Amino acid sequence: MRKLRLDPYLLLLLVLALPALAPLAAPGYMFDAHDGRHSVFYVQMFDASIRDGALWPRWAMHHTQGLGYPTFLIQAPLGFYVAEVFVLLGLSITMSVKLAWLVGTLAGAWGIYRLTVYWLGDHAIAEWRAGGADGPRLDGVRLAAVASGLLYTYFPYHLVDLYVRAALADTLLLAWVPWLIYAFDRLLVLGSAPGWPRRLGVAALVLAGTLLTHAFALLSIAPLVVTLVVFRLAQRWRRNGFPWSETLLACAGGALALLIYAIFLVPLLVEGRYLNQQVYVSGGYDYRDHFVQVGQFLSPYWGFGYSDDPVGANDGMPFQLGLVQVVLAIVALFTVRRAERARAEMGYLLVVGVGLLFVMSPLARPLWDAVPPLAVIQFPWRLLALSGFVFSALGGLALWNLLPSALPGVRPEGGLVVMGALAMLASYPYIQANLSPIEPWREDGRAVYQFEREHPDMFGYTTWVTQPFTTTVLSAAYASPDYVEHHGDAPADGRLEITAGKGSVVESYVGGSSAGGVVAMQTPGTVRINVYYFPGWMV
């Protein structure tokens, strides 16, 4: 049996990635970040539904002032499951969210490390495992992979997602992207070689996991996979004729992923029409107001505000690509034709990177207008997440090809160490968060109640609502100084209401996905359960 050997370069990368997460170790939480409160109270309501027996949650009971809302019909659930693991282990909601970010960040760094090693030559791993007669020496391929991982971890928009936006699903999506490209690239490059069923299954599962992490991944991440498939098939076609087996494998991988994703997509398509979804693509979520000006890609500006200037001149949040990433992209542009390894991959990344920058710019508005489903993405600048992957992978490949020889010694490899350190230092000033104390009400239904009071325009209505409202019979319970909640079991008072006849409410209860109680009626009458009506409720 072969002895398991740890990769010291991977361990080095994971250790060097930890400073990017330093604010997560501090007391407090980013409640004032764009999605900071959502990341916490979504997990709180997800946990309440899990504990109430809904293993695939759909309902978030605290929304709409206690009437509830099918939040998890439109919010992809996988990120919440990651946090839920830590909640069930006994950790607090906010600590669980922080640990989910930790897992996602390290998984993403590991993924792009593995992809870079793969693109620069898997034989390097075999050579490393076998050892060398000359004794230990630095490995240029894995050091380039470490550089890619650091570029990805410290990419400015990754820090934006963590500390400016505090967006759980968006940040965890970054963990999937390199693994997704790696899985599909192996599926296409190795084709029908032995082991193809395993590679097919892995590719399908990784794509399904990506889609189940964020609702907009189908419209943003999936097209990236399509570009990779087209790139590899075109390569094979030029050499050996049309690659039928690879084409079938790619289609099968996508189809299997969609079959898994159907558990989320089908209810969304069937029942989403009962929700007033215009609120999610209008007002502050209108993509027309969130394109990125070219200068913003290069601007060193950093702030914790919003993308609130339609022309981009005074946006309160940063959209920079990062100094090191830009320099390495320019270097790659001028050296790609002379690259010794991964030349085709560098060319692919350059084309995709330029395409992403175009799609985020105002020049692409006709494209967004012509494809209405793209409005679901809401913010064109969200594609900076993909740019981070593209330019980080490109940076690692470019760095290796800048080395003086194919089998570099210690001296040229030192340049990789320096560039990896520069990737960290260039973004180090941005590793900061606006932290607030974690008060008890921040982790129960009062957090949702308070948010809806501050943002009544964010109320979720169904098609059965004829008149907008901002308070319910349950609002007073949330505002009460005596409010107490354990895993979503409040507010119960006011949950049952006798609307006709005479009687009294003996007891009532509420859970994450259920509500009810006992009523003693003196005459025939009608009892209303104060919960939003929606298809699927069982009485």
What are these regions (language model features)?
Residues R2-R5, G131-R137, P194-G195, R236-A250, ...:
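Membrane-interface helix-loop-helix junctions at transmembrane boundaries of multi-pass membrane enzymes
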Residues L12-L21, F72, L99-W119, L138-G191, ...:
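Membrane-embedded helix bundles of polyisoprenyl
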Residues L16-G108, L150, F155-L173, R288-G303:
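Membrane-interface coil-to-helix junctions
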Residues A17-G28, S49-L55, L91, A144-R165, ...:
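Membrane-interface helix-loop junctions at the exits of transmembrane helices
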Residues L102, D170, L219, P373-N401:
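Hydrophobic/aromatic-rich transmembrane helices and adjacent perimembrane loops
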Residues V226, G254-L258, V354, A393, ...:
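Signature aromatic-anchored transmembrane alpha helix within multi-pass, membrane-resident enzymes
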Residues E246-L249, G253-V336, I438-T499, G503:
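Periplasmic/ER-lumenal interhelical loops and adjacent helix-loop junctions
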Residues P481-M538:
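Active-site-proximal, structured, solvent-exposed surfaces of multi-pass membrane proteins
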